[in-house]
Amino acid sequence: MRNAKEHPHTGIVIGIDVGISTTKIVGINTEGTVLNPFRIRATDPITSLYGAFGKYLHNNGIQLDDVAQVMVTGVGAAYIDEDIYGLPTAKAQEFVADGLGARYESGLEKMIVVSMGTGTSLVKCDGDNIRHIGGTGIGGGTLQGLSRIMLKTDDIKQVAELAKAGDISKINLLIGDISAHPLPGLPKSATASLFSNAKTNASREDIAIGLIYMVLQAVGSSTILSSLESGIKDFVLIGNLTLLPQCREVYDAMEKLYNVRFHIPKHSEFCTAIGAALSYRNNSFATH
């Protein structure tokens, strides 16, 4: 794998995020415009990367000569040790890519980036100071696995559709179930205990909404706890889980409860790939 070119402002930079379940690819032109983000389901990292790259170039009418640099990131980047289609190729640090992409898409300088993929990672950003501060094993993989066991499907779109007809009060124990009055700082609609109200004959729809709320609330609570003493009130959500329609209702409630702000940018699921490309423009990448 060659080092990145020394003239970083000519030609299109391609950013590729090779994840566990999906591979995402974007191009950024010399004006800094994101060009038609695209993703495919990952099979194995090499096949997914080359398949995504070839299809992206074809769909956008981009020639190999138009590409100045390819930047790869994500867990699958470890398998890439050669130039892609003979183009200069380098690796971007994933957590830096998370931060750069979220900053670009949100316009914020100070935030915690919540990368909601198979698991969840937390990255603190304060200007150019981008640092991984932790994470949780709860994420999209958790939702898929539990749905596989409890709903006999791991199709997240199907689970989200089922959840639209679900009643969360039949699954979660709420403050209003245990107290006649709101508690200090906790309205009666706040969750007291996840799944504590579930019955043996719970419907598929109620189970679906319960699973989604459990994952999203756990991620949200972890994020808020990670921000304590930092003064940060802005959290930028990126990754595939941000596509769940239930995100907005869960995080709107948490915003009111904790006086914080959850942001879901336009290209939320592509932020890491965008950040990988931007890391080349910023010269903040690893080449090996």
Regions found by a protein language model. Name each.
Residues D128-L183:
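Glycine-rich phosphate-binding loop plus the immediately following alpha-helix
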Residues V13-D17, V67-M71, M111-S115, G135:
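Short glycine-aspartate micro-motif
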Residues M1-P8, I80-V114, G119-N129, I274-N282:
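Conserved phosphate-binding catalytic cores of ATP/NTP-utilizing and phosphoryl-transfer enzymes
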Residues L100-E105, L143-S147, V260-H288:
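Glycine-rich phosphate-binding/hydrolytic loop that grips phosphoryl groups
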Residues F38-A42, F53, H58-E94, G127-H132:
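Short beta-strand-loop/turn "lid" adjacent to the catalytic site in phosphate-handling enzymes
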Residues V72-A78, L225-M254, E269:
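Glycine-rich phosphate-binding loops at beta-strand->alpha-helix junctions
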Residues P184-D234:
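Adenine-nucleotide phosphate-binding core of ATP-dependent small-molecule kinases
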Residues A4, P8-G51, I130:
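Short glycine-rich, Thr/Ser-proximal phosphate-binding strand/loop in the N-terminal lobe
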